Amino acid sequence: MDLNTILIILGILALIGLVAHGIWSNRREKSQYFDNENAFHRNPQSTGRPSAQASQPMTPNFAQPAKETEQIRQTYQEPQVRQMSSSPEQQTRPTAQAMPENRAEFNPNTVQPEQQPLDFNAAENIKITLPNTETRAGGAEPIRYEYHAEEERSAPLEQTFNQPVYTEDRAVPDMQVSLRQPAPESPISQPTLQQPVNDAPAYQHSQPAPAEPTDFIMLYVVAPENRQFHGPSLAQALDNLGFIFGQGNIYHRHLDLTVASPAIFSVANINQPGTFNPHGMQDFSTVGVALFMQLPVAGNPRANLKMMIQAAKNLASQLGGFVLTEQQEEFDVMAEAAYLARV
């Protein structure tokens, strides 16, 4: 025989053995389960009789004389008092003894009927017949008293509930009288405090703050006599010095060389109307430009003024012109010192 055939036969035999072993073990477990269930059902039947006998309530004979009736009433009252005065551990002990079904083995001799919990609802509905205390004619029927524990318990509650009702009725007229009385005048309601006290400070805040005096510092850069600055040369020189064409159609020198930063000084055309046309600089010409700075200015005024003086000198050098003061005089060292002294 081939080796593969032998291995296949051995595998089939092993599978058959495993299936047979599984079926056999399953049947054995089922048989053990049914045996345990039958034993479990037999135990409650054997233990049910003592509990049934213990749960039978006592039926007193109501036709007994007065002494026997008094003894019966004491027998029902003493277990109740004993159970109320006992500790919580003693109260839970009969409950644990009254459930024998949870134990594997149960001895019927250990059942104590006197420790079973009493049915208090049945005791409350018991009618007790007492003998007549007064001497009456023979043949008079005894008076029957019905004991209702619920009425005795609810009576104090009704009294305590009705007491606040009368007190509330008495308090209502007092409250109405107090409301009708006029409220005493307090110094808070005086008309003097209703006057607008804060009108003067509000008026002071509404007044605009006095504007700071404005001043202009100006320099001229002019071409030589009988000559002019041409547009392309002027635009190139202004771009090299960091000027940007902007508001008012003139060039501005900003604090941070960006349009977002404030302008510190500007350049305007001397000729009217004093503006520039960046798209027509090829045909543009002028005799000079004016550099001016308005005070107060952003940043350090003295540093900004020095920067404007240096820009005027550089612009005159690139265009071949010269710098003049506001009085159209030559801008020399003395004039520069006088300009710096103004800030």
Curated annotation (Swiss-Prot):
Keywords: Cell cycle, Cell division, Cell inner membrane, Cell membrane, Membrane, Transmembrane, Transmembrane helix. Residues 26-343 are cytoplasmic. Essential cell division protein that stabilizes the FtsZ protofilaments by cross-linking them and that serves as a cytoplasmic membrane anchor for the Z ring. Also required for the recruitment to the septal ring of downstream cell division proteins. Interacts with FtsZ via their C-terminal domains. This is Cell division protein ZipA. It comes from Actinobacillus succinogenes (strain ATCC 55618 / DSM 22257 / CCUG 43843 / 130Z). Residues 39-98 are annotated as: Disordered. GO terms for cellular component: cell division site; plasma membrane. GO terms for biological process: division septum assembly; FtsZ-dependent cytokinesis.
